[in-house]
Amino acid sequence: MAREKFERNKPHVNIGTIGHVDHGKTTLTAAITNVLAKKGQAQAQDYGDIDGAPEERERGITINTAHVEYETEGRHYAHVDCPGHADYVKNMITGAAQMDGAILVCAATDGPMAQTKEHILLAKQVGVPALVVALNKCDMVDDEEIIELVEMEIRELLDSYDFPGDDIPIVQVSGLKALEGDSTWESKIEELMTAVDASIPEPEREVDKPFLMAVEDVFSITGRGTVATGRIERGKVKVGEEVEIVGIRDTRLTTVTGVEMFRKLLDEGMAGDNVGLLLRGVQKEDIERGMVLVKKGSITPHTQFEGEVYVLKKEEGGRHTPFFAGYRPQFYIRTTDVTGQITAFTSDDGSNVEMVMPGDRIKMTGELICPVAIEQGMRFAIREGGRTIGAGVVSKILK
């Protein structure tokens, strides 16, 4: 079947839903597609479509990151429904890195919970520039005062993580009622999308820089070859162009023989697009999540770097005890988790310290066990045992 071409007639924005488990992120995502489908701006999806594979739904917990697409009057959106359960924060770190903005879903019945806070912190760490709040399950709260209190609490929380709490729109919604077709609540979904259009700035695309795409997933398509999927971070890539596969193993050259977005063919993919790239002569085993596809000669992988790091306090979900030089955590870089070592550190003012306490800001030297495409100015998270314990930025490449 010939695939239809993707029409690029509206600005494209990547957003997603974040927030505490069971606050209604997936239901709200489904409601958005259903409300917009009535205007011909989306394909309606139900909860099951978005929640994905059966074993995840049996536990009632979303594990994988689901992608849906829809349009508003002025924009085309790719929307990721991020995992909410604490165990899957790892997925969120890799998923949230793709967001130009996020809808923070918070249930009016509960108010902000542990993961609400963790997701706001993560949004800050991975550089999500703007948030809009969907105060969900408002059909279940009769008392206007309770809603006002929850709104105040959310605004204070946003402020504490350096988001502009007073300015961020909070829209009262009910994903479930909107899904059931209740017109009052459907109009609140439209109000939410108007707020998203207005408050999430159109991203500045880095189209003119050399092409780079971090690999998120790899598929083998019988008779066609290997497809790598991911979000193009910068630059553009045309069919027929040579690209390099960099990181984890030896760099190798391949040719892009096809570019697809949402099952439609493109002549070229541009910064911000979530695409699948068909690669010539590459086996599925040759490429894995965490590698990057780049313009030939534009980037080399590295193992040693200096970074500026904030180590989370115990109250923020970080470590309870100090760590010392030689500490071996996981470094989350783009879509990769790489084991590494913090070989040396000083206090952020350059003075010597024996150990790093939760809440400290440090300058550190890190060494990774395998080479990865790290660059100056890039953000990373430091994790251990399934939780974020630090957030940093690469200040200098050493080797």
From Swiss-Prot:
GTP hydrolase that promotes the GTP-dependent binding of aminoacyl-tRNA to the A-site of ribosomes during protein biosynthesis. Residues 81-84 are annotated as: G3. GTP binds at residues 19-26, 81-85, 136-139. Residues 60-64 are annotated as: G2. This is Elongation factor Tu. Keywords: Cytoplasm, Elongation factor, GTP-binding, Hydrolase, Magnesium, Metal-binding, Nucleotide-binding, Protein biosynthesis. Monomer. Residues 19-26 are annotated as: G1. The keyword S-adenosyl-L-methionine does not apply. Pfam families: GTP_EFTU (PF00009), GTP_EFTU_D2 (PF03144), GTP_EFTU_D3 (PF03143). Its EC number is 3.6.5.3. It catalyses: GTP + H2O = GDP + phosphate + H(+). InterPro entries: EF-Tu_GTP-bd, EF-Tu_GTPase, EFTu-like_2, EFTU_2, G_TR_CS, P-loop_NTPase, Small_GTP-bd, T_Tr_GTP-bd_dom. PROSITE patterns: G_TR_1, G_TR_2. Mg(2+) binds at residue 26.
